[in-house]
């Protein structure tokens, strides 16, 4: 069904947790649905910076873009944590991990309250997508760059994606990682 979002601004990503959908987007737009997407309400945040990614874990939503923000009340109210700019966020093993331009990786083990910059080995490459599965985080981006962490985002190693195209998004399901990008789909072999 096509339902009204209640906004004229672009929405970029959606996450689900605690029976709540949260969608984030252009100029700080935050939309919240607690009835399986039938109706959408505004979350309260005092800024108008773009939000590109959102994830849920441990009863906390974390959204990021030109700011890191978090909500512990199912997206009704949001607090700014950092002014660092990132593109995507994922949650796994009680850890939030965010990625962004020039190989930026940050992680949080306290539900998004504080963040630690990590060395990704991807300096010079914009990272656009991030996911968690099989106790690993994977991030991907510019020029086919693909990196993984097996220790909750603390350290990262390069993985040969076998492509040089821009990669934009990655997901995990049925024991496979699938990344997509510019005229490209990559699938993990193990």
Q: Where in the sequence are the language-model features?
A:
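Residue-level hotspots at or immediately adjacent to binding/recognition sites across diverse folds
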Residues: 1-190
């Amino acid at each position: 069904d096509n339902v009204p979002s209640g906004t004229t601004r672009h929405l970029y990503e959606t996450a689900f947790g605690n029976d709540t959908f949260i969608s984030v987007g252009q100029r700080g737009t935050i939309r919240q649905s607690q009835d399986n997407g039938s109706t959408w309400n505004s979350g309260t945040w005092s800024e108008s910076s773009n939000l590109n990614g959102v994830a849920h874990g441990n009863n906390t939503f974390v959204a990021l873009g030109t700011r890191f923000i978090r909500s512990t009340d199912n997206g009704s109210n949001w607090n700014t944590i950092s002014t660092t700019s990132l593109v995507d966020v994922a949650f796994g093993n009680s850890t939030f991990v965010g990625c962004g331009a020039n190989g930026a990786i940050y992680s949080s083990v306290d539900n998004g309250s504080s963040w630690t910059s990590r060395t990704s080995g991807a300096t010079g490459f914009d990272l656009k997508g991030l996911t968690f599965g099989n106790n690993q985080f994977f991030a991907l981006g510019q020029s086919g760059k693909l990196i993984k962490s097996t220790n909750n985002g603390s350290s990262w190693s390069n993985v040969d994606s076998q492509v040089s195209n821009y990669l934009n998004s990655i997901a995990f399901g049925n024991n496979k990682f699938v990344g997509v990008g510019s005229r490209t789909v990559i699938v993990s072999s193990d």
